[in-house]
Amino acid sequence: MLYKKYIHDYPNWTDWQIDNNQLLPLVANVRLLQGKLLGQMQSLGFELPLEAQLDAVTLEVIKTSEIEGEILNKEQVRSSVARHLGIEHLYNPDTLVTPTREIDAIVEMMLRASFYFNQPLTLDEIFAWHRALFPTGFSGLYKIQAGRLRDDRTGAMQVVSGGYGRTKVHFEAPAAQLLPDELAKFIAWYNEEQPDLDLTLKAGIAHLWFVTLHPFEDGNGRLTRAITERMLAKSDGSARRFYSMSAQILATRSEYYKILESTQKGLTSVTDWLVWFLQTLGQALTMALTRTQRTVDKAQFWHRHRNTTFNERQVMMINRLWGDFFGKLTTKKWAMMTKTSADTALRDINDLVDKGVLIKSAASGRSQSYELSSHADS
């Protein structure tokens, strides 16, 4: 066999070669974790799964953009997700903010991708997603053809790194003139029922296939992850998302790019890629199970303290501590986050210490820090 530079240079390159002996144990583990997570959600009643879904979708939207170097406003994303899910009535209106048009469009795209998992994927739908990513027709300062395939007018589509004079080409996508046929083949395969191919494996192959085609000027990574989410929703048998694959990809981004590049420069065996994909999916599910338990613990905390008096600042900060609070809680940080004085912040904190909600951290350093007490989360 004559070795080619990229996987798509081989004839019949999408006749994917996989080693089931390596993959089936990983598939079994992922399926077990999926079952645990969905079973856990079914046991939580009505509101807690909604909160878990809100958290997971918010995380997915933020992280799929962060992978591309774009930082979205979390509160705007969360508010947009709540409105699209129709659960904004469960939250204090003062905590919901108005999202930008761009954020609203991205949220809608991600939700539609999973919500319609039982419907065939179409090229028109992918075009609509692309337009949602770039509603102004610009990517940063550059005008792009939103909702249209790339035409390679300015040269071949390449994935590169490094600055001027030291550019490294990691990958070159198929030529633009091949895209209509290649995408038609991909979409036909994506929609075809294949009883012998587990849907978690199909999600991994779809991810590799679409990102290898790189059919647009920009946004290919986010579209790839939306397409992956759709197949994962089908594998779950549920449009409700409770875990974030993008968050786990971001956490191992260097490994992701490394295995992707080696696969795209290899032969047609994609076993190593699928091993990485399934392991990463398993990690995403495990993290979701941990977050879900945190959600349960938070609900139990508020139930135990249903007759305890807290002021609005304390309620806000306790919820932050149960959620995505980063770093150590200090009087200074409390004052800054609640927009109050240091004296008021200290009174708020001391009151929570007296009520057994907070304890002083053992290793506080130069300034005293606090954390939830052990019996607050048990």
Stretches found by the model and what they are:
Residues 1-378:
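FIC/Doc superfamily catalytic core
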